[in-house]
Structures are given as C-alpha cells and as structure tokens.
Amino acid sequence: MRLGRIAHPEGICFAIIDGPKDAPMQELVAKEIAGTPFTPPEPTGREWKLNEVRLLAPTLPTKVVALGRNYADHVAEVFKKSADSLPPTIFIKPSTAVIGPDAAIKIPDYATNVEFEGELAVVISKPSKNIKAENWQDHVLGYTICNDVSSRDLQFKDGQWARAKGIDTFCPLGPWIETDLDSLNLDDQKINAYLTHEGSREQKQDSNTDQMIVKMGG
C-alpha cells in the first residue's frame, strides 16, 4: 500500500495513493483516509486524481534520525577515505527541515556549497526504544525517499553536522510511504537522483543500498 499526505481543494489529509505500480502519476488516485497512517486506514469515500492535488511530506516527524557515512561509495567520494577508516555516525535533522517532494529547497546566503543526497528513509510506526535487531520490522510502517540536503562548506567548517544538514527545507520527503515490506529487497535497492530543468533530465547520483556499511536491521 502507498500512503501519502496531500493538499486538496478543501484542505489537507492523509490518503491511500491508488493505482498500478508502474502507472504514471497522472493516472493515480488519492483516496482520503480518516486520521493518520499510523492506524488501520479507513477510506472516507472522498478521492481526487493525483494531478488535482499537491503531494506534501507523507509524514510529520518530530525529528529525523540519520546515519551518516553509511555508504562506502559516498565515504570515498566526499571524505576521500575508506569505510574502514571512517565509521558511520548518527546525526539529527529537525522537523523544520522537512518539506514535500515538490517543495522548493531554500538555500541561505551563508551556505555556498550545497549538495543533494538521495536516501532510503524508514518510517517508524510507533514510539520505540531499545529494539532488538530481530524485531526491528515490527516497528516499521514503511519506506519513503529522503533528500538529505547538505551544505558541505558548513559541514567541514563546523566539525559537526547540525547546521549543515538542519537548515529549513533541507529534508524533502516523499512522494509517499510504501508499506509493502515483504516485496522490497532492502539490501539491493537503487538510489538514484536526477536534476530536471525545462524538459532536460540529468542523472546526478547512481548508488545502491548494497553499498550500506550498516545494513537494515543491523
């Protein structure tokens, strides 16, 4: 199931994004659900074509907990070191960084070297703490896409990552949450990013979750 959050002509709601997996966006339908995706979804009967609404961030996290330096190829590209010599590190993006998939990223004047990072994002289904590795999927609602926007100049200048990665709008999420946990091989998912402008489309990132140092559930 695909669960999203939309702005429609009468307000904002969560919705089931319905349609074939390979259908173009304009053929998908957003079916409003009562409440939030964190309870069994109950359709209200209202629906809109997806091109009649605006996709928002599919969830409203209190914070985004991230694992940096977790892709071997990315560590080599950005930090010029091997994954063995530079272990992963945890950092947090604030809720104010979260925006929808089509919202504008606003770069402040003091950030002069801003880069994208396409990421696999895990949406936690309930308050959780001290989870055993073998039970991790019991706490997952689904997966979405994150653009971990980063100001490299601030990141290396500050020595810590809060400012460089936590600027307002520096965490686009979406377009929706995919809840079909069994159909995804999380150890072999392509992570691609494209830059589009006036009809042109240029691939800017070509990675895969098989480059993860700490695997899902690890």
Please give the residue ranges for each predicted region:
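Catalytic-pocket segment enriched in acidic/His residues
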Residues: 10, 32, 45-46, 74, ...
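Structural signature of FAD isoalloxazine-binding scaffolds in flavoprotein oxidoreductases
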Residues: 83-101, 116
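Short loop segments at secondary-structure junctions
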Residues: 20, 96, 125-129, 149-150, ...
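Short hydrophobic-aromatic micro-motifs
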Residues: 5, 64-67, 120-124, 142-145, ...
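N-terminal non-catalytic cap/leader segment that marks the start of a structured domain
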Residues: 1-89, 184, 192
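Non-heme Fe(II) oxygenase catalytic core, chiefly the N-lobe of the double-stranded beta-helix
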Residues: 102-136, 141, 145-154
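A generic local secondary-structure boundary/capping motif
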Residues: 4, 54-56, 78-81, 105-114, ...
